[in-house]
Amino acid sequence: MSSFETTIGLEVHVELKTKSKAFSLSPVNFGDPANENTNVIDWGYPGVLPSANKGALESGMMAALALNAQITRDVHWDRKNYFYPDNPKSYQVTQQQTPIGHDGYVEIKKEDGTSKRIGIKELHVEEDAGKNSHSGKGYSLVDLNRQGTPLVEIVSQPNISSPDEAYLYLEKLRQLIQFTGISDVKMQEGSMRVDINISVRPIGAEKYGTKVEIKNVNSFQYAKNALAYEEQRQRDELMAGHIIGQETRRFDEPTKSTILMRVKEGADDYRYFPEPDLPVIHVSDEWIKAVKSSLPETADDRIARYINKFALSKKEAAVLTQTLEMANFYDQVVDDGADPKRTANYLIGDVNAYLNETQLDLQDTKLTPGHLSGMIKLIDNGTISTKQAKKVFTAITDGEEPKAYVEKNGLVQLSDPNKLTPIINQILDDNQQSIDDFKGGKDRTIGYLTGQVMKKTHGNANPKIVHEILLAELKKR
C-alpha cells in the first residue's frame, strides 16, 4: 500500500456558445479564416469601450446553478495583467474578486458503487486569448478570432484524490455543462480545456506537497495519463529524498509523460485591479429565478424519465445520456413513433458501434432520427426482419430513406399466409421423416423445417408467421 496521498485540483475552461464575444460585437465562429472575427475592442485600441455580454453572464449563472453553486449578487470585473503575443490588450478581463458562482459541488459515481462529492470553489466568466501558431521558420503568427470569446472557468476544490477520480469528475462536469446548452464542450475544437494542479505528500502530513501545474490538457484521457505519470514521478522523487520543485509542465502524448516548461520561484503576480470601463452588475432574485426557470432538463432528470416512462434499465438510460446529442436523438426517434426499447437497443448497440468505427460525432453523420424511426417501425410492423434490418441500417447511415430502400431492393418480408402456406406444404411433402420426428416428440424438428422455409424464400419469410403455419399444418398430418 502506498505511503503517499495525492491532492488534485482542476481548472476547467469552457467556451460559451454565444453569438458574439464577451465584451465586443465580434461574432464567435469556430473555423473561420484567421483574424476575420475581430474589431478594435478585441485589438485593445486606446479609447474604445467594452460592453458586457448579458448572454455570457447568464450562461455563467446557468453553469453555477447546474453545479449547485451560490450566485454572487454584485459582480464587478477585474483586469488580469500579463504580456503575451496572443493578448494585444496586455490584460484579460475576468472576475477575480467576485466570481459569478462559488461554493458548489459535483457528485461522481465511482466504480465500486460509492459516491463522492467534489467541491467547486468558484466559477468565473472571463474572456479567452487569441491563438499563436509557430511555423518553425523564425516567426510566429497570431490569430485573434478567439480573442475575447467568453469563457467560464470552473475551479475545483483540491479534494480529488486520484487520476481516476479526476477523469470521472471531468466526465460528469462535461455532461452537466452540455445539458445546460451553454457550450458544446468539444475538446477537439478547444471549447473545453483543463489545467491541472497536483501535489503528493506522505500520508498524515499536515501541509500539502508542492504544487505542480500541467497546462492546457485537451483530452480527458490525456488528463488521466498526465496525472498518473506525474503522481508516480513525484512519489519517486520523494522516495529518493529529493525536493519537488514548483513547476509548470506539459503533457507529452507520445511518451505519456509530463515535460518541464518552466520553474516557478513564486506565485504569479498579475496585478489585478478593478476594470474601470465596465460597471458593477447587480444580480437580483428575479434574474436568478428567470435564469433557473430557463434551465433545460438535466441528464439525471432524463435518466429518471427514461426509466419511469419507457421502462429502460438504469444502465441503458445512463448510456443514452452520456451526451446531449445522443439523448436528443433518442427523444426525437421515440417522438416519431418508434418503440422506445428497440430504439434504445439500436442507439446503444449498432449506432454506437458505427460511431466508434467511423470516429464521427452523431451530428456529423447522415443518420437522421426520422430514418432510424422509419426502420424500427418497418421491423415492428413485420415489413422487414431483424436480419434484413442490418442491410437497411447500413443504408440509412448513408442517408437513404428506409422504406424506399426496402422496396427498391426487394427486402419486404413475406408475411402473407396465402403465399407462405403452399411453400410450407411443399417443404413438408419433401420431409416425411421430419413430420414423423415431430409427432414422435422431437420439437427441435420445427427449427429445421423453419430453416428450410427460410432457405426456400431466400431469407424473406417472416419467421413468426412461418412458425405458426408450420404448427398448424403439422397437426393436420
From Swiss-Prot:
Keywords: ATP-binding, Ligase, Nucleotide-binding, Protein biosynthesis
Catalytic class of the enzyme: ligase
UniProt feature coiled coil, ranges: none
Any one Pfam family match given in the protein's UniProt record, by short name: GatB_N
Catalyzed reaction equations: L-glutamyl-tRNA(Gln) + L-glutamine + ATP + H2O = L-glutaminyl-tRNA(Gln) + L-glutamate + ADP + phosphate + H(+); L-aspartyl-tRNA(Asn) + L-glutamine + ATP + H2O = L-asparaginyl-tRNA(Asn) + L-glutamate + ADP + phosphate + 2 H(+)
Annotated GO biological process: glutaminyl-tRNAGln biosynthesis via transamidation; translation
EC numbers on record: 6.3.5.-
Keyword Electron transport belongs to the record: no
A molecular function GO annotation: asparaginyl-tRNA synthase (glutamine-hydrolyzing) activity
Keyword Protein biosynthesis: yes
Domain of life the protein comes from: Bacteria
Subunit relationships: Heterotrimer of A, B and C subunits.
PANTHER family: GLUTAMYL-TRNA GLN AMIDOTRANSFERASE SUBUNIT B MITOCHONDRIAL AND PROKARYOTIC PET112-RELATED, GLUTAMYL-TRNA(GLN) AMIDOTRANSFERASE SUBUNIT B, MITOCHONDRIAL
Similarity field: Belongs to the GatB/GatE family. GatB subfamily.
Protein purpose: Allows the formation of correctly charged Asn-tRNA(Asn) or Gln-tRNA(Gln) through the transamidation of misacylated Asp-tRNA(Asn) or Glu-tRNA(Gln) in organisms which lack either or both of asparaginyl-tRNA or glutaminyl-tRNA synthetases. The reaction takes place in the presence of glutamine and ATP through an activated phospho-Asp-tRNA(Asn) or phospho-Glu-tRNA(Gln).
Protein name: Aspartyl/glutamyl-tRNA(Asn/Gln) amidotransferase subunit B
Originating organism: Oenococcus oeni (strain ATCC BAA-331 / PSU-1)
Biological classification of the source: Bacteria, Bacillati, Bacillota, Bacilli, Lactobacillales
